[in-house]
């Protein structure tokens, strides 16, 4: 993989502050970092030179893991897919309530936002109801947007639930989809390695959990119907019915349009 964990090229042209210096193990990493610096100085997206970033890897599999690509607009996705018609895309879906709270915990831990009263609904809303948070909080809309452009055989949805339950099997499934060697062992990290394991998480009270669940009630049900898999169990975690009728989902297109609009 690239020496930078999240490139953020298509959303911020890689002009982001990083908490730690990038890896630089060999000549390939050095070439990548030098090319990335030049590329990020350009005024707009340059797909040709972006593709050249991965040339040092030659025939090896390589890619770009950037969670915020889930917020890219249809136009940017279209351009990417037209330039890379055989691009394989993976989306890791997570229960919106859990994802939102985990993200707030991370932001507080890294002092991206000020600590707040986690028991106060108004304080929670002030930190939660931000454009950047909401853009990444609707996995059903993200999947729908990418599916409009990526061929079905080149797009896969995986679930954070599977990462928690059986990380080894999830890793094998992803490697199989990518066409990688399933028997090759990682010489550095195990499948269940979690760099965030030591991070202190904010306490999620029952009151706030219920509040967030009500906010995401429709999205939880939409994910269950549209994404399937472990998402089918998400509504029941919060006491919501898992029975779905066509008319319950009839205005999903309004939700997708709204998410596209704020993107």
Q: What are these language model-derived features?
A:
Residues 34-37, 64-69, 121-135, 199-208:
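Surface-exposed cleft-lining segments at the edges of enzyme active sites
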Residues 1-66, 83, 87, 99-103, ...:
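PAPS-dependent sulfotransferase catalytic core
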Residues 18-37, 239-263:
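Membrane-proximal basic amphipathic "stem/tether" segments
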